[in-house]
Curated annotation (Swiss-Prot):
Its EC number is 5.3.1.12. This is Uronate isomerase. InterPro entries: Metal_Hydrolase, Uronate_isomerase. One of its GO terms (molecular function) is glucuronate isomerase activity. NCBIfam families: PRK02925.1 (NF002794). Signal peptide: none annotated. The gene is uxaC. Pathway: Carbohydrate metabolism; pentose and glucuronate interconversion. It comes from the Bacteria. It comes from Shigella boydii serotype 18 (strain CDC 3083-94 / BS512). Belongs to the metallo-dependent hydrolases superfamily. Uronate isomerase family. The keyword Isomerase applies.
Length: 470
């Protein structure tokens, strides 16, 4: 019997252990996509307690707690921090088999140093007190934890209308060497069907000093904000394409679509597709000219529980996987961007693992001469951000493309404790390659495979995003 979560956790061959301990373990973290609040990094936020850093805003945990029958007041409601933590501690023993069980105990190990102790109602007091004592120390502030975890770069997720004042404040602080850069997330500018679209156009017009009436005006406003983001070091964009659409339109049609929507009219699905296509093609060309990377997160079915959405809003754990086809529309969108050689470096993520091979083969259609891995099949996202999901994504990437050129893991998280997800990923990567060696499917060449592991853990992302590190 193998003990739970030792230093060799998941490393079930000698070759895997060598790969992890000698090549993967000490690689820095390049966290190119996350949802950390830049204000907390700028202020070097001190966390009030373990709830504040661990449960607040974590829809993964809330979802598990609801499944365990926990009342909503103990998830997102008015219960005290300690009551909410106790409800989580009572849920954790029921999460065996869920990635939350592994994540929880990896996060207690690093950075808190708690080993050999499982979170449950019987250990809740001890763990609560021990972690809270550590959180009062300087090296457990927001920046302190990032430094402990050997982070070199984080890319936050930011709206085109954001001031980026906190990124500017961080950049001016020469004592803090971790790069904290904005990522451009323009969803509200192309989701023309949303009720909030008109208000957003007014805000975008205000911050860009542009009167947005025609499609060319929208392009002008977005270009000004792209310049603003570039001035703050942005090299990355991200888009939630819950449904991939493609339909072409001429400028007169786009002007009409925008004008009628701004006048309060409801558009047809075809008109929505025309508008979104035009915005994404325009933005893709801008990214290509600037040397940016674009990310497409595809296939979420959001806000399924309308009653809870009305009470609590979005992003609180009521989303799931869509099964709408997307291969043809995605192919047309990428091909359109590529027509004039203005398809930027692109990372594609799918929420439905059924689509792994769709993306794994799609990226091979649009690779770039002289640019290894220009098109990327992104790491297992959201519901696939677990052992089986990561293994499937990497296996299918290896079978259909070049695993050695993969840009690796990202946290996609709102928590400063999520950096152990990079450790989890690295252990799974080394386990997988170690098993290939054990089965005679890959050579037992530690230099060849060790260098490949180092590249996937850090070097590939550093080179791909072309961000100069401190």
């Amino acid at each position: 019997m193998t003990p739970f979560m030792t230093e060799d956790f998941l490393l079930d061959t000698e070759f895997a252990r060598r790969l992890y301990h000698d090549y993967a373990k000490d690689q820095p973290i390049f966290d190119y996509h996350c949802h950390l609040p830049p204000q907390q990094i700028a202020e070097d936020y001190r966390f009030k307690n373990l709830y504040d850093i661990w449960l607040k805003g974590d829809h993964y945990k809330w979802r598990a707690m609801r499944t365990n029958g926990v009342a909503e007041r103990l998830c997102t409601g008015d219960a005290s921090d300690r009551e909410k933590f106790d409800a989580w501690a009572a849920t954790v023993p029921h999460t065996i088999g869920n990635p939350l069980y592994h994540w929880t105990h990896l996060e207690l190990r690093r950075p808190f140093g708690i080993t050999g102790k499982l979170l449950s109602p019987s250990t809740a007091d001890e763990i609560w007190n021990e972690c809270n004592e550590l959180l009062a120390q300087d090296n457990f502030s927001a920046r302190g934890i990032m430094q402990q975890m050997n982070v070199k770069m984080v890319g936050t997720t930011d709206d085109p209308i954001d001031s980026l004042e906190h990124h500017a404040e961080i950049a001016k602080d020469g004592s803090f060497t971790i790069k904290v850069l904005p990522s451009w997330r323009p969803d509200k500018a192309f989701n023309i069907e949303q009720a909030t679209f008109n208000d957003y156009m007014a805000k975008l017009g205000e911050v860009s000093d542009t009167d947005i009436r025609r499609f060319a005006d929208l392009q002008t406003g977005l270009t000004k904000r792209l310049d603003h983001f570039a001035a703050h070091g942005c090299k990355v964009s991200d888009h939630a394409l819950d449904v991939v659409m493609f339909a072409e339109a001429n400028e007169a049609e786009l002007d009409s679509i925008l004008a009628r929507r701004l006048a309060g009219e409801t558009l047809s699905e075809h008109e929505v597709a025309q508008f979104k296509t035009a915005v994404l093609v325009f933005l893709g060309a801008e990214y290509a000219r600037r040397g940016w990377v674009q990310q497409y997160h595809i296939g979420a079915l959001r806000n399924n529980n309308l009653r809870q959405f009305k009470l609590l809003g979005p992003d609180v754990g009521f989303d799931s996987i869509n099964d709408r086809p997307m291969a043809e529309e995605l192919s047309k969108l990428l091909s359109k961007q590529n027509e004039e050689n203005l398809l930027p470096k692109t990372i594609l993520y799918c929420l439905n693992p059924r689509d792994n091979e769709v993306l794994g083969t799609m990226i091979g259609n649009f690779q770039g001469e002289g640019m290894p891995g220009k098109m990327q099949f992104g790491s297992g996202w959201w519901f696939n951000d677990q052992k089986d999901g990561m293994e499937r994504q990497m296996t299918q990437l290896a079978q259909l493309g070049l695993l050695s050129r993969f840009v690796g893991m990202l946290t996609d998280s709102r928590s400063f404790l999520s950096y152990t997800r990079h450790e989890y990923f690295r252990r799974i990567l080394c386990q997988m390659i170690g098993r290939w060696v054990e089965a005679g499917e890959a050579p037992a060449d530690i230099n060849l495979l060790g260098e490949m592991v180092k590249n996937i853990c850090f070097n590939n992302a550093r080179d791909y995003f072309a961000i100069e590190l401190n």
